[in-house]
């Protein structure tokens, strides 16, 4: 099936009056100018959608006249070639009249109601950034500058390179704030690197934990899962919600919010007690088994049922089914890591793979078959490009602002956790902020972070739009080119590598790679190290080492071909010395083995086992558990709520899901307007209620990213950070929901 959408169709109904009624914050009038396009010849271009938090993801074929995109459709040769509503709406975003098209500088003091934005040239903006960053470096030290990437994730490699050669180890991103990296962190504590993955043709059973791929990844994940079910694979799903994925399960498990760790330990105990573990694998490749066996003893099926609400017989059946493998496991990127004990809860689930020997085996969960210099694209593409070795030096780790706040994260991760930014600004540890796609609403109690930015010596941000809640007290706001207007980055899809063929940016927008590289050349005086500000040359610095080039990949379009630098898949890489950097057999852990008992956690005064900690209990005044940040299939958090009216037509305001019993108890019906009340928020939070069995009784799920009086992040406390990851507790907050009048709320 081919999806094709024209510019005329997607912009229909989005005239000035309609758009003005939908956008929360209009950009300065400067941004309403448009760039004239020349030429009438029609041509075909290729790019990648950046609407999801998975990158690089789905391919887009577009047709343009001159420099105007007139129609988009599936890029059928691309590995991910189906577009969803978010991908289709990117064309509307491209020609949104509120786009930021020129660099803006504040002229009024910070804290003023009107920042006094004026248009300036790129030359002035770059000189201003270089002068201010170098002034902070000279007076306080390079580590007093925080470099940060939010969304899109695409500019992370050059921004990290910028931080490196500016000599600041304080580089963070939204994944080190509150996204998916905590689950990777949990796996690394036991396995040394990320492992959990989806089913393969030889998989007999797969366990999916807290992952609603039917909405988060409908075309890739869910289509593959349906195909696997059709061939007869057994499916275990552990999810607090009754999702479409859970509906497919042979054994659906629905624990109470925050009790996943108890469920995982209950399954571990069944494996041990019934002799379902792979003892030979454990003896050769694992450590800490005796401690695990001893701790698991208390998690009897009856105890687990009482604690989690999952029937004892289902706990036993799930453990037996998983043991009858080969089995794979898919762990959550978003949900469980945001519990109060999230990292340990993920770790407990992950140990099921090692206990049954389903580690990098045929049909089991696998490590990626990447060359050792390659890292997850959003951490820099290659260790060489970002000079990862420098970031990992002890003297650089000691300068990071997360050293005391999240010491385990500090030791394990190359990305800094910036969650203690308000405290670090007050203490003088951070004096300047360089933000690429930054969104201050990502944090709990965002007002604390807005105040922190206000008190900095200097700050700037790049973005597609002017966003007042983030940019109001910045010194500069820079216009970023969108996905149709960018060359970088190239895409890595398994062993395949894709290039792009873009249009020219509107106005004076620059792609983020060009911005970061140009700033790097300006602050260091070394243009060559930053490729003269050229994104394609930066890409070629990696692609040439891989035996290819950007031009070569462009010449292959529309085809996306294998890059031979990426090796063919192998199994049991741990036994062949293909994982460790010293080329010895084993894993990238301190012991060289899978660690049931984490030596790193113990080193920092935490239990070495992923112990279970009971979640906060609901109270009489706050009897409902809030799950904040759930997905919808047509919107990704805050990314598309004010920029693409087409998507707002699908859901124009915040909607919370509530079980019929809870709705009945409160006299609520479908579509009622409600207020959410939290002990941590000074104001109520507005929403509409959806009555559904998607939620179990006693919980409410809400979406993160709405603005104004729909902003859910104000209900999340800036305390109870996960001690293992430093992540906020977004999914264990107790609230109440009450019916609201249609009047304006009172604080």
Q: Which residues make up each language-model segment?
A:
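Conserved short loop/turn motifs at secondary-structure junctions
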Residues: 145-153, 306-310, 333-340, 372-373, ...
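N-terminal export/assembly segments and adjacent metallocofactor-ligating motifs
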Residues: 2-276, 298, 311-312, 519, ...
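Long, contiguous, secondary-structure-rich segments that constitute the structural scaffold
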Residues: 512-563, 641-657, 661-747
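Extended redox/cofactor-interaction regions of prokaryotic respiratory oxidoreductases
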Residues: 157-238, 261-265, 351-473, 481-489, ...
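Acidic/polar loop patches that form or flank catalytic/metal-binding clefts of enzymes
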Residues: 278-279, 315, 329-330, 358-368, ...
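Short acidic (Asp/Glu) and glycine-rich catalytic loops that position anionic groups and cofactors
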Residues: 243-248, 295-300, 326-332, 429-430, ...
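Short beta-alpha connecting loops at secondary-structure transitions
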Residues: 250-254, 479, 495-506
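N-terminal leader/propeptide and maturation segments of large enzyme subunits in energy/redox metabolism
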Residues: 106-122, 276-311, 503-585, 650, ...
């Amino acid at each position: 099936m081919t999806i094709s959408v024209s510019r005329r169709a997607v912009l229909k109904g989005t005239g000035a009056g309609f758009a003005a009624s939908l956008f929360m914050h209009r950009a300065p009038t400067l941004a309403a100018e448009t760039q004239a396009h020349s030429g009438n010849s029609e041509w075909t271009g290729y790019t990648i959608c950046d609407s999801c938090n998975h990158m690089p993801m789905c391919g887009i074929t577009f047709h343009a006249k001159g420099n105007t995109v007139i129609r988009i459709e599936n890029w059928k040769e691309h590995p991910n070639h189906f577009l969803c509503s978010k991908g289709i709406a990117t064309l509307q975003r491209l020609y949104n009249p509120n786009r930021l098209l020129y660099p803006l500088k504040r002229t009024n003091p910070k804290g003023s109601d009107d920042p006094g934005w004026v248009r300036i040239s790129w030359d002035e903006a770059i000189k201003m950034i270089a002068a201010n960053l170098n002034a902070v470096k000279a007076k306080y030290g390079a580590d007093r500058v925080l470099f940060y990437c939010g969304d899109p994730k695409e500019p992370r490699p050059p921004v990290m390179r910028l931080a490196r050669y500016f000599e600041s180890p304080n580089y963070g991103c939204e994944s080190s704030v509150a996204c998916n990296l905590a689950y990777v962190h949990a796996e690394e504590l036991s396995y040394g690197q990320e492992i959990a993955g989806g089913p393969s043709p030889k998989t007999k059973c797969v366990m999916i934990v807290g992952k609603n791929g039917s909405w988060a990844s409908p075309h890739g994940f869910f289509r593959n899962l349906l195909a696997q079910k059709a061939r007869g694979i057994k499916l275990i799903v552990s999810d607090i919600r009754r999702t479409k994925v859970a509906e497919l399960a042979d054994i659906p498990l629905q624990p109470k919010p925050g009790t996943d760790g108890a469920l995982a330990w209950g399954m571990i105990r069944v494996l041990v007690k019934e002799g379902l573990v792979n003892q030979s694998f454990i003896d050769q490749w694992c450590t800490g088994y005796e401690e695990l066996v001893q701790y698991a003893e208390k998690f009897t099926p009856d105890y687990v049922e009482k604690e989690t609400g999952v029937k004892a017989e289902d706990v036993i059946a799930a453990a037996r089914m998983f043991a009858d493998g080969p089995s794979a496991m898919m762990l959550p990127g978003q949900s469980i890591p945001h519990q109060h004990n999230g990292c340990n809860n993920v770790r407990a689930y992950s140990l099921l793979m090692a206990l049954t020997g389903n580690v990098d085996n045929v049909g089991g969960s696998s490590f990626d078959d990447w060359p050792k210099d390659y890292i997850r694209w959003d951490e820099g593409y290659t260790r060489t490009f970002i000079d990862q070795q420098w970031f990992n030096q002890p003297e650089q780790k000691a300068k990071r602002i997360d050293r005391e706040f999240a010491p385990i994260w500090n030791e394990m991760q190359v990305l800094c956790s910036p969650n203690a930014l308000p405290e670090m600004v007050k203490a003088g540890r951070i004096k300047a902020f360089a933000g690429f796609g930054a969104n201050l609403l990502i944090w709990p109690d965002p007002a604390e972070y807005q105040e922190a930015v206000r008190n900095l010596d200097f700050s700037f941000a790049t973005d597609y739009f002017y966003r007042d809640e983030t940019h109001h007290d910045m010194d500069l706001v820079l216009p970023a080119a969108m996905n149709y207007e960018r060359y970088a980055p190239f895409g890595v899809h398994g062993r395949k590598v894709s290039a792009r063929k873009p249009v020219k940016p509107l106005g004076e927008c620059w792609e983020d790679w060009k911005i970061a590289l140009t700033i790097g050349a300006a602050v260091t005086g070394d243009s060559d190290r930053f490729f003269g500000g050229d994104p394609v040359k930066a890409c070629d610095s990696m692609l040439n080492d891989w035996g290819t080039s950007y031009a070569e990949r462009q010449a292959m379009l529309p085809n996306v071909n294998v890059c031979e630098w990426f090796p063919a898949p192998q199994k049991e890489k741990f036994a062949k010395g293909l994982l460790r950097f010293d080329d010895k057999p084993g894993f990238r852990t301190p012991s060289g083995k899978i660690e049931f008992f984490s030596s790193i956690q113990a080193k920092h005064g935490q239990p070495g086992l992923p112990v279970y900690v009971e979640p906060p209990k609901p109270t009489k005044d706050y009897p409902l558990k809030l799950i904040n940040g759930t997905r919808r299939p047509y919107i990704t958090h805050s990314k598309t709520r004010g920029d693409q009216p087409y998507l707002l037509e699908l859901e124009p305001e915040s909607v919370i899901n509530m079980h019929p019993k809870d709705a009945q108890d409160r006299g609520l019906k479908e579509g009622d307007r409600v207020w959410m009340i939290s002990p941590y928020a000074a104001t109520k939070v507005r929403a509409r209620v959806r009555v559904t069995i998607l939620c179990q009784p006693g919980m409410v799920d809400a979406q993160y990213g709405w603005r104004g009086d729909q902003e859910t992040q104000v209900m999340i406390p800036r305390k109870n950070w996960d001690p293992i990851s430093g992540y906020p507790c977004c999914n264990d907050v107790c609230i109440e929901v009450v019916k609201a009048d249609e009047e304006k709320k009172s604080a």
